């Protein structure tokens, strides 16, 4: 039985960030184990072909943990965000220049970050990687937790952290209740090339079926997230590239000129999942294991990184017992408001903008017009977009 201070189940974005943050904040004082089912040299589903938008606040957290310098070279800045409603004049714009920041956020490809994180994890002397391996069974005692792996090894620690994704094996084993809501939408994702250079602009276009988001990437590509009812998404996935681009052009419009090229497409169902509790005895939950959100407004990953930052900070306040109940309670209390507010905001936006009822259509267009003309109304959206929220 090998002794550790912290065992982290899951080595994708949330788990890897937590391990590296603990290493930096404690100057390698804590022994950390990362248990990951996928081998380092294989394609990791947590580091797949998708892109994500890192908010200004998330980048600030990564800077604090000394991770941003490694990620920055492969990140594309978002200098402007344009929000509009299809077939209506209402719109609002947010620009980095108006806010007084270098960028509102940055877009990174998960595959790039995966390679960077794997290299950093392997080089860190206080982190041990168990891969390929998975948590098979968990036993909890008064002052420790035993983590039995499917390769026959057993790890003992003061704290187990679940960062093992939306369908968390650790959470299921320990009976952590999961609340779910099916949005009855499917996200179609792909990279596209447009006629006009994006110039750092991101777009969120609301339609009667769901939002269409385009994020700026390197080489003048755009990362597409197109939310549709499942039957329409199935139809769109079967279209030829030419037909797909034509349909996308109809939904998005001509703000970037002609849609010229589309890469490989993928799709996944959109379901809100969140754990009613994010702690238990000698156990904490972060990232997608704690909550998985609708991609509208790009809040999910950034919320998960705020989980990671708060937990890392609380762990380092009590190094003599990193899994103490007092530390976990402080983590829970810190995260409660942000989790509830972000889940409520994203869910409300989905219901407000993903339909064509006349009353809601009028209300959302009026809201966009007012936000574009009254800066006070734009501030809550702006702070959430930037990730500048209390944690």
Give residue spans per PLM region.
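Beta1/beta-strand and adjacent pyrophosphate-binding region of the FAD-binding site
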Residues: 1-12, 33
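N-terminal Rossmann-fold NAD(P) dinucleotide-binding loop
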Residues: 15
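Glycine-rich FAD pyrophosphate-binding loop
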Residues: 23-48
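N-terminal FAD cofactor-binding segment of flavoenzymes
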Residues: 46-86
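Conserved FAD-binding catalytic core of PHBH/FMO-like flavoproteins
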Residues: 62, 160-258, 262-265
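Conserved N-terminal helical subregion
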Residues: 74-173, 181-186
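FAD/FMN-dependent oxidoreductases across multiple families
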Residues: 234, 238-325
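C-terminal helical "tail/cap" subdomain of flavin- and related membrane-associated enzymes
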Residues: 313-391
């Amino acid at each position: 039985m090998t002794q550790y201070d912290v065992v982290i189940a899951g080595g994708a974005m949330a788990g890897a960030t937590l391990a590296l943050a603990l290493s930096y904040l404690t100057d390698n004082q804590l022994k950390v184990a990362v248990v990951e089912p996928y081998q380092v040299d294989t394609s990791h589903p947590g580091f797949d072909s998708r892109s994500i938008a890192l908010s200004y606040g998330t980048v600030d957290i990564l800077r604090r943990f000394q991770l941003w310098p490694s990620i920055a070279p492969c990140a594309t800045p978002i200098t402007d965000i344009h929000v509009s409603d299809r077939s209506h004049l209402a719109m609002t714009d947010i620009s980095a220049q108006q806010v007084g920041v270098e960028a509102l956020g940055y877009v990174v490809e998960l595959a790039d970050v995966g390679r960077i994180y794997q290299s950093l994890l392997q080089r860190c002397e206080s982190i041990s990687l168990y891969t390929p391996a998975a948590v098979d069974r968990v036993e909890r005692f008064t002052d420790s937790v035993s983590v039995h792996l499917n390769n026959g090894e057993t790890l003992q620690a003061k704290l187990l952290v679940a960062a093992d994704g939306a369908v968390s094996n650790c959470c299921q084993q320990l009976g952590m209740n999961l609340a779910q809501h099916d949005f009855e939408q499917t996200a179609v994702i792909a990279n596209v090339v447009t006629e006009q250079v994006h110039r750092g602009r991101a777009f969120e276009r609301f339609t009667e079926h769901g939002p269409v988001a385009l994020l700026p990437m390197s080489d003048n590509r755009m990362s597409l997230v197109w939310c549709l009812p499942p039957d329409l998404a199935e139809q769109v996935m079967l279209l030829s590239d030419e037909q797909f681009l034509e349909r996308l052009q109809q939904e998005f419009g001509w703000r970037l000129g002609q849609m010229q090229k589309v890469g490989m497409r993928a799709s996944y169902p959109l379901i809100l999942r969140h754990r009613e509790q994010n702690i238990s005895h000698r156990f904490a939950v972060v990232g997608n294991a704690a909550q998985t959100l609708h991609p509208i407004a790009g809040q999910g990953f950034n919320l998960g990184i705020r989980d990671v930052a708060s937990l890392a900070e609380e762990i380092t306040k009590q190094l003599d017992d990193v899994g103490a109940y007092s530390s976990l309670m402080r983590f829970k209390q810190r995260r409660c408001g942000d989790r509830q507010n972000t889940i409520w905001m994203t869910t409300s936006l989905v219901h407000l903008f993903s339909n064509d009822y006349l009353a809601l259509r009028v209300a959302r267009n009026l809201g966009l017009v007012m936000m574009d003309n009254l800066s006070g109304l734009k501030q809550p959206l702006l702070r959430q977009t930037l990730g500048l929220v209390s944690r």
